[in-house]
Amino acid sequence: MTQWYPASPALWQGRDDSIEAPDARRLFQTVTRSETFSPENWQQKIALMGFACDEGVKRNAGRPGAAGAPDALRKALANMASHQGHERLVDLGNWVAPTPDLEGAQQALRDAVSRCLRAGMRTLVLGGGHETAFGHGAGVLDAFAQESVGIINLDAHLDLRQTDRATSGTPFRQLAQLCDAQSRAFHYACFGVSRAANTQALWREAQWRNVTVVEDLDCHDALAQMAQFIDKVDKIYLTIDLDVLPVWEMPAVSAPAALGVPLIQVLRLIEPVCRSGKLQAADLVEFNPRFDDDGAAARVAARLGWQIAHWWR
């Protein structure tokens, strides 16, 4: 059974510059850490949650280790300067998945996300492998059952695989099937896709599902496509697989990208999403601290989370 644990206070430590000025604060000083999972107490705040699971990565024959990412990313966030928006972050702990019960873990995350959103919070989830996306996305769909939900994925992979069980490569096929079962439209856009990393069968599935696909080669000029997708939906779930970044910026993932989309381009793409007023949920997935020898990759990933919280409207 998937267990919930509050985040350790030892994770939220950093340099104290408060002697300089009242507003010389860092995230470890402004993030609220909750000892209970009680989203009803935190309306209008951003629920920061960890999904400590890489069972889907293992099933997908990837490099395990992403289960350790949530706490590693908290440590990287802790010492970053606190600016507008960061005071809204409430750390609602980690969902820890026992091997091999991926399906139970995804259901626990789904229920937690739905509860947060129904309580008036927004969710920022630190994965975990990209199996995080099915639990997170399903929770968003549950919370906004009467509205159109757009899924924006920044990823080298379409993650529309067809297998006999859930993996880190199947979350968007699972979400598409969930939409089918609920007789609702499946709105999915994937930016940063590597044609070299996706078979023709996956491209055919994306075409059949009317997925908006922007290749890694074209992301430098994709703001119009992003704006068009934002305009056609009521609510947005943003998921960032860190393997969308080039290997020289993000080596610490299961499948590093030979080409990838540079961090500055990723930030330019997500800014209008964050400022749209439609973003309800976001996550960072696939970070693997086992392959981050000096902590530099954690800081890259944390900067994305920092920027999302800062821009979120």
UniProtKB/Swiss-Prot annotation:
EC top class named in words: hydrolase
Pathway(s) it belongs to: Amino-acid degradation; L-histidine degradation into L-glutamate; L-glutamate from N-formimidoyl-L-glutamate (hydrolase route): step 1/1
Catalytic reaction list: N-formimidoyl-L-glutamate + H2O = formamide + L-glutamate
Binding site for Mn(2+) 1: H130, D155, D159, D241
Gene3D superfamilies: Ureohydrolase domain (3.40.800.10)
InterPro entries named in the record: HutG, Ureohydrolase, Ureohydrolase_dom_sf
Classification via PROSITE patterns: ARGINASE_2
Keywords carried by this UniProt record: Histidine metabolism, Hydrolase, Manganese, Metal-binding
Annotated positions binding Mn(2+) 2: D155, H157, D241, D243
The keyword Metal-binding appears for this protein: yes
Keyword check for Metal-binding: yes
GO biological process: L-histidine catabolic process to glutamate and formamide; L-histidine catabolic process to glutamate and formate; putrescine biosynthetic process from arginine, via agmatine
EC number of the protein: 3.5.3.8
Cofactor note: Binds 2 manganese ions per subunit.
GO molecular function: agmatinase activity; formimidoylglutamase activity; manganese ion binding
Cofactor: Mn(2+)
Function: Catalyzes the conversion of N-formimidoyl-L-glutamate to L-glutamate and formamide.
PANTHER family: ARGINASE/AGMATINASE, FORMIMIDOYLGLUTAMASE
Family: Belongs to the arginase family.
Record-given protein name: Formimidoylglutamase
Organism: Salmonella agona (strain SL483)
